């Protein structure tokens, strides 16, 4: 999701020439020759896009698995702007669903109503409706009620005063952990469904411009896989895209507008500074495609960082081409493990203090996209340091300078 400020989201069609619909609208209706407003698409009425292309960006030897996806929007009429996000409504991992069913002592064929009150089977509700990797407090309360004294410690965490302690306790835990820890907690199928949250929409910053790639949308996604408490954990949406879709899958999507995360008008001479390490590069790829298509005036400076140039330099040929054509004025790269001392984008920002401050004095907009937990804070500190040192200001004056940038909408963040 792209906007001024931070986003807080829970680390998931017209007929083609062969007659198969690349993208369908609500309820599977085809919109042959009739372009529909993007506003009609939402969670209840998503655009059903199809996978057009999937490419692994990170090399096989990289510890990361970052991928490039292209979804076909042909005939849907769905439009977006650089800076928008694509909402993806994923399904859960079938293997995890089977584990939950086994822990519940259910076959999966039991009749239930899902969380939209639609009749279905328990298995299908767990696949498509319930957020079984996220814990709802109703579920924990049900565990406490059913188990009694053995769950006393858990009960103590459910009082409002222990909210932070509960959040720490739940970190890295999923529904399956509690079902296995408290096997004496027995649930009827419908009762269990009622204790769950709805499967969460995942928002991905769009990494393409419609002017460069009409009727398609590109995503740059890090596949999340990790271990916690002795179990392998999977990012719901990222592994849905990486493992559970193919060219025939209808992927429910809609646009989430990034109203404040926008480029200046093409004719404006306003410089833009873009800081997007890792998958934070996504909206800036869209920005540069848009600038190339509109022959935008004004300078552009990109900061990108990853683990290694050899394994994780995403879209390298595109950046080099933009430099050569003048669409991109400057490119600074930070590959953290390519030298003894780890170097990140914030270090590159500080190294370029004099020139970067000169751009800011020319009215540059400073954009940041990516990790909110560490990167965004580190970049923010670097920005303050640049302004204080190159601008020969006190820390208080640098803070006031950044505050003015925010007021003037020249400091824009899409962090998550």
Which residue stretches match the model-derived regions?
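FNR-like FAD-binding dehydrogenase module
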Residues: 1-416
């Amino acid at each position: 999701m792209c906007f001024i400020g931070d986003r807080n989201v829970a680390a998931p069609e017209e007929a083609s020439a062969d007659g198969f619909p690349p993208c369908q609208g609500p309820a599977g209706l085809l919109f042959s020759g009739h372009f529909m407003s993007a506003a009609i698409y939402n969670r209840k009425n998503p655009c059903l896009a199809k996978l057009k292309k999937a490419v692994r960006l990170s090399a096989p030897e990289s510890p990361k698995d970052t991928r490039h996806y292209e979804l076909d929007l042909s005939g849907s009429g769905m439009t977006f702007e650089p800076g928008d996000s694509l909402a993806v409504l994923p399904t859960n991992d079938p293997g995890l669903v089977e584990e939950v069913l086994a822990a519940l002592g259910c076959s999966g064929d039991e009749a239930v109503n899902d969380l939209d009150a639609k009749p279905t089977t328990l298995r299908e509700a767990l696949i498509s409706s319930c957020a079984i990797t996220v814990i709802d407090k109703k579920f924990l309360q049900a565990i406490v009620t059913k188990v009694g004294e053995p769950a006393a410690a858990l009960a103590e965490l459910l009082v409002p005063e222990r909210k932070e302690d509960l959040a720490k306790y739940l970190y890295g835990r999923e529904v399956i952990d509690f079902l296995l820890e408290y096997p004496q907690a027995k649930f009827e199928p419908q009762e269990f469904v009622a204790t769950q949250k709805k499967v969460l929409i995942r928002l991905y910053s769009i990494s393409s411009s419609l002017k460069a790639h009409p009727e398609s949308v590109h995503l740059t996604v890090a596949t999340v896989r990790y271990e916690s408490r002795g179990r392998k954990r999977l990012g719901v949406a990222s592994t849905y895209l990486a493992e559970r879709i193919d060219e025939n899958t209808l992927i429910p999507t809609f646009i989430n507008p990034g109203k404040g995360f926008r480029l200046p008008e093409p004719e404006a001479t306003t410089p833009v500074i873009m800081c997007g390490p890792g998958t934070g590069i996504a909206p800036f790829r869209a920005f540069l495609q848009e600038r190339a298509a509109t022959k935008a005036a004004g300078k552009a400076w990109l900061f990108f960082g990853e683990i290694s140039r050899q394994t994780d330099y995403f879209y390298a040929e595109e950046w080099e081409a933009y430099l050569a054509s003048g669409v991109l004025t400057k490119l600074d790269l930070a590959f953290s493990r390519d030298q003894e001392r780890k170097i990140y984008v914030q270090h590159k920002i500080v190294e370029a203090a004099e020139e970067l401050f000169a751009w800011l004095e020319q009215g540059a907009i400073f954009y940041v996209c990516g990790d909110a937990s560490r990167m965004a804070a580190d970049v923010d500190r670097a920005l303050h340091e640049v302004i204080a040192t190159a601008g020969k200001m006190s820390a208080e004056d640098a803070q006031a300078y950044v505050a003015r940038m925010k007021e003037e909408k020249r400091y824009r963040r899409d962090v998550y």
